Amino acid sequence: MELIIATRKSKLAQVQTEKVMELLKEKENVDSKKLLVMTEGDRRLDVSLNKIGGKGLFVKEIELALLNKEAHGAVHSMKDVPFELPSEFELVAMPEREDIRDAFVSLNGSTLSNLRKGARIGTSSIRRAEQLKLFRDDLEIVPIRGNVQTRIKKITEENLDGIILAAAGLKRLGMEDVISDYFDPKVFLPAIGQGALGIECLKGGEFNDYFKALDSKEVRTTVEAERSFMKVLNGGCHSLIGAYSEVKDNDLYMIGTFTVNNRIVKKDILGNKEDNILLGKKLAEKILGEV
């Protein structure tokens, strides 16, 4: 038997899927192969995500492959997955979470603190752009899209002083050496689910148990808390929303940020990790209480 796993065509998406394939072989002794799918988010690289719908643009065509029984499961970056899935699907596993931090990439090794005044920084993320302005309001934010390799090329092509990328993607691609600096995730909050992988299947799928065996309880605890936070705030690519969460013993600690009445609000919460979804909701309500 060979499981078919749908994923995007990008190098990073394929590397992430290969990691899941390795885990399937290692834990379940099951062979698998990739089904590469071109998503709307991959096709429309000329427009910023917040103008064409944001979250879900990297998921819909892949879900169609599951619906058409062309694949048994799909691997996503959790930060691309909308907080509400269509009723036919479920997230059966979140197998691993890489480094959750954002990374600063510059070709000359500059760090954020020693950049020239008015430096040009590339990012298409409102979350990154708004938090960056809190550090250095003199910086010029330049919107860029494309895969990791394309964005790095744009440093030269668009005369940028640097760009911001997720550390997880760079590490998975073996490109850690291009990182000049890391952002403290408790200060510069990551995207919801950043660094985490998710496996989506049709509900009640015949082979779902193979994928479920790869689930990490700790990863699921943190990511579900963050997604609960996002759901209350209805946040996506068009708004500043970020969260940091960590499990320590029986506790879950979370920090969240969101824009309320044009003001960036940041709050934290601590509670029992078994109440992860409730804690995410309470943190969101705490932030909305600032209205």
UniProtKB/Swiss-Prot annotation:
EC number(s) recorded for this UniProt protein: 2.5.1.61
Instruction: Read off the CDD domains from this record.
Output: PBP2_PBGD_2
| InterPro entries in alphabetical order | HemC, Porphobilin_deaminase_cofac_BS, Porphobilin_deaminase_N, Porphobilinogen_deaminase_C, Porphobilinogen_deaminase_C_sf
**Transferase: present as a keyword of the record?**
yes
Pathway where it operates: Porphyrin-containing compound metabolism; protoporphyrin-IX biosynthesis; coproporphyrinogen-III from 5-aminolevulinate: step 2/4
Tell me which cofactor or cofactors this protein depends on.
dipyrromethane
Keyword line: Porphyrin biosynthesis, Transferase
One GO biological process this protein is involved in is:
protoporphyrinogen IX biosynthetic process
**Pfam families, per database record:** Porphobil_deam, Porphobil_deamC
Residue list for modification S-(dipyrrolylmethanemethyl)cysteine: C237
This protein's GO cellular component annotations are: cytoplasm
Reactions that this protein is recorded to catalyse: 4 porphobilinogen + H2O = hydroxymethylbilane + 4 NH4(+)
Is this entry keyworded Protease?
no
Q: Which SUPFAM superfamilies match?
A: Periplasmic binding protein-like II, Porphobilinogen deaminase (hydroxymethylbilane synthase), C-terminal domain
The note on the cofactor says: Binds 1 dipyrromethane group covalently.
One Gene Ontology term of the molecular function aspect: hydroxymethylbilane synthase activity
HAMAP family, from UniProt?
Answer: Porphobil_deam
Question: What's the stated role of this polypeptide?
Answer: Tetrapolymerization of the monopyrrole PBG into the hydroxymethylbilane pre-uroporphyrinogen in several discrete steps.
Give the family, as the similarity comment puts it: Belongs to the HMBS family.
Q: What else is known?
A: The porphobilinogen subunits are added to the dipyrromethane group.
Complex and partners: Monomer.
Protein name, entry field: Porphobilinogen deaminase
Please report the organism this UniProt entry assigns to the protein: Clostridium perfringens (strain ATCC 13124 / DSM 756 / JCM 1290 / NCIMB 6125 / NCTC 8237 / Type A)
Q: Which gene encodes it?
A: hemC
